[in-house]
Amino acid sequence: MGFHTFDADDADRLERASVRYRRVSAEEVVGPLAGDGAGVLADLGSGTGFYTDDVAEYADTVYGVDVQPEMHEYYREKGVPENVELVASDVSDLPFADGELDGAFSTMTYHEFASPGAVAEVARVVRTGGRFVVFDWTADGDGDHGPPVDERFTADDAVATLEAAGFEVDSASTRTETFGVVARAP
């Protein structure tokens, strides 16, 4: 399961607000992160910066982390907010110090990096008590949209992986095609 990467040639599809916000609203991502004063955050799998832009309004700094340089190129052409810094990196080897981030989020990209090692890396870089917000396609969905079902995870899978890395899960929910998990770093 997992490790499906979105085709950068189709990056325009990631900017369709009417479609994306039906799956995950900006408020669902921003709310858990802005509640404690957002500070320094990382968008893991930032792509074109669609959700990065929403969160940037409430944060001092947001690192847009993506493994595909083409996604950063698209984002630069679109326009990157002043408080967003683009970082080319795999989630399993993040270039941040221990506890450097006040929080992190991943919208529809968890399946691209969801290994115990990558989640442990997120736990390393997010300060104790900082939130990690995950929304992704669920393996319980029909697969009409998003990655193939056999490359997805369930909310229970994500909770188990996060808890194994020391995260304390605040909430987990499943919808028709997506799941959401909000957790706090150890």
Spell out what each predicted region is.
Residues 39, 60, 102:
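Conserved acidic residues
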Residues 117-131:
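A short glycine-rich, Lys/Arg-flanked "PGG" loop and its adjoining helix->strand segment in the class I
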Residues 34-35, 56, 113, 126:
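A generic alpha-to-beta junction signature in SAM-dependent methyltransferases
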Residues 13-20, 131-182:
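C-terminal alpha-helical "lid/dimerization" subdomain adjacent to the S-adenosyl-L-methionine
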Residues 102-116:
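A short SAM/SAH-binding and catalytic strip from SAM-dependent methyltransferases
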Residues 1-36, 50:
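Conserved class I S-adenosyl-L-methionine
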Residues 42, 47-93:
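Class I SAM-dependent methyltransferase SAM/SAH-binding core
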Residues 92-103:
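A short acidic, Gly/Pro-enriched loop at the edge of an enzyme's catalytic core
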